[in-house]
Amino acid sequence: EQALQLKEVGVTRYHSNIETAPSHFPDICTTHSYEDKMFTIDNAKKAGIRVCSGGILGLNETLEQRVEMAFELKRLNIDSIPLNILNPIKGTPFEDNKALKPMEILRTFAVFRFILPKALIRTAGGREVNLRDLQSYALKGGLNGIMVGGYLTTGGRSPQDDLRMIDDLELTRTAVQL
């Protein structure tokens, strides 16, 4: 019912990250179940609202669980996928997580692209800290885009630096309304 109300007032896309692989979800989220998440996504889609959904890399998931998450997004027919990378912050439940290495992240992006060849896949939170000088490789190795500016809990690079990177790669700048 709520999804239909959102559709009636003009909502065209709803964001609801699956966060991680279904098999890893109970270890990550304690406020709701994976079934609750699926209920929300299914209702939005049934109401005719497109769904944007992705997750966070670096939550102590296995490589197999990363692949599982990609196939889950494919099963759900998600065409807009943000991939965040955990930036361990002191005072949070994941403060002691070991940061992922840049090449591991880039390989993960390539696997997602292989599994989801037509999806809009982009990276957002944690990319500056985790990819460091290799951020541009993500755009040449599988991602369609990056989120620019600050994120929910941390700041990002300046938009000017990101635009310069895009220009240096000789890519076309396209603002996407999600």
Give residue ranges: language-model regions.
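Conserved non-cysteine loop/helix-boundary elements of the Radical SAM core domain that shape
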Residues: 1-48, 56-77, 92-104
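Short glycine/serine/threonine-biased micro-segments
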Residues: 8, 52, 56, 124, ...
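Short beta-strand segments at enzyme active-site cores
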Residues: 14-16, 50-55, 81-85, 122
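Hydrophobic alpha-helical segments
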Residues: 34, 41, 50-51, 109, ...
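A structural motif corresponding to the C-terminal end of an alpha-helix
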Residues: 40-51, 111-121
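Auxiliary Fe-S-binding modules of radical SAM enzymes
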Residues: 71-178
